[in-house]
UniProtKB/Swiss-Prot annotation:
Protein's gene: ecfA2
Subunit comment: Forms a stable energy-coupling factor (ECF) transporter complex composed of 2 membrane-embedded substrate-binding proteins (S component), 2 ATP-binding proteins (A component) and 2 transmembrane proteins (T component).
The protein's role, per its UniProt record: ATP-binding (A) component of a common energy-coupling factor (ECF) ABC-transporter complex. Unlike classic ABC transporters this ECF transporter provides the energy necessary to transport a number of different substrates.
Keyword Membrane included in the entry's annotation: yes
Swiss-Prot/TrEMBL keywords: ATP-binding, Cell membrane, Membrane, Nucleotide-binding, Translocase, Transport
Membrane topology recorded in Swiss-Prot or TrEMBL: Peripheral membrane protein
Pfam families to which the protein is assigned, alphabetical: ABC_tran (PF00005)
Family stated for the protein in its record: Belongs to the ABC transporter superfamily. Energy-coupling factor EcfA family.
The ABC transporter domain, residue ranges: 3-246
Protein name listed in UniProt: Energy-coupling factor transporter ATP-binding protein EcfA2
One GO molecular-function entry: ATP hydrolysis activity
PROSITE patterns referenced in this protein's UniProt entry, alphabetically: ABC_TRANSPORTER_1, ABC_TRANSPORTER_2, CBIO
Disulfide bridge positions per record: none
Organism: Staphylococcus haemolyticus (strain JCSC1435)
Length: 287
């Protein structure tokens, strides 16, 4: 599924003294099968933007094209419903939305509402839960007897199992332990690569953004100010400070080495493997 924003503006409480423009003439194209990250400081418009992807919010002005359907301010909810099946949105702390007394019923809830094949969804969910380290009797267990990290994984799986074309993730690893963070992020990447899914990640963790995203959308004050690759973004030193975007740890290490040795690497590395190769090449050149 391709999603295209055409001059989209969104205003909260329009026509009242509390009117606030959260999105300002957004033009954006999301291509099928790519991994995007949306970054920017709190209040930049990220959460408002992602709620437009599946029609939870409708543009005040402009429109959004989802393949055959165009959403604008007057589009009725009954026409948006199919979009919500194709675009899965995982909110921050999705475990707070769990309410069924066992995991099987929790997994069934979404597909029943959309008239989907419940057994197929449950089978996909079971496979995903096993991949994330749950026991084989997981479906009969209560989510409320599990740790916060396990509940997060269950909530995420309940969305992934419905097999959306586009998966929108709002800070999906916030509060998780390092092992769970890696498990969840690797699962998203695997789904993108193996199933040609579109991933849209909102995150303040630039280590995750640098490692997984192919394209980064930078937001500030309701505007998109950059849409670039990770390497293009993280070589912009002073602008990153202006936008309140931290460097990934591996890039910060490179900067520290450059300052210490008075050198300048030809490029930047976004992974430990890339950095080791680049550093060894520099050492060899020095010898």
């Amino acid at each position: 599924m391709k999603i295209k924003f055409n001059d989209v503006t969104y205003t909260y409480q329009q026509g009242t003294p509390y009117e606030y423009k959260a999105l300002d003439h957004i033009n954006l194209t999301i291509e099928q099968g790519k991994y995007y990250a949306i970054v920017g400081q709190t209040g930049s418009g990220k959460s408002t933007l992602i709620q437009h992807f599946n029609g939870l919010l409708k543009p005040t002005n402009g429109n959004i094209e989802h393949d055959e359907l165009t959403i604008h301010s007057k589009t009725k909810d009954k026409f948006i419903r199919p979009i919500r099946q194709k675009v899965g949105l995982v909110f921050q702390f999705p475990e707070s939305q769990l309410f069924e007394d066992n995991i099987e019923r929790e997994i069934e809830f979404g597909p029943k509402n959309f008239g989907m094949n419940v057994e197929e969804v449950k089978e996909r969910a079971f496979d995903l839960l096993l991949e994330l380290g749950f026991p084989r009797n997981v479906m009969s267990l209560s989510p409320f007897q599990m740790s916060g990290g396990q509940m997060r994984k269950i909530a995420i799986v309940s969305i992934l199992a419905m097999n959306p074309d586009v998966i929108v993730l709002d800070e999906p690893t916030a509060g998780l332990d390092p092992k769970s963070r890696q498990q969840v992020m690797e699962l998203f990447k695997e789904i993108q690569l193996k199933q040609n899914k579109t991933i849209i990640l909102v995150s303040h963790d630039m280590n995750e953004v640098a490692k997984y995203a192919e394209e980064i959308i930078v937001m500030n004050d309701g505007n998109i100010i950059e849409q670039v690759t990770p390497k293009e973004l993280f070589r912009q030193g002073s602008k990153l400070e202006e936008w309140h975007i931290a460097l990934p740890d591996i890039v910060q290490l490179q900067r520290d080495i450059e300052i210490k040795h008075g050198i300048k690497f030809k490029t930047i590395a976004l992974t430990e493997k890339e950095f080791v190769s680049m550093y060894q090449e520099w050492q060899h050149h020095e010898e």
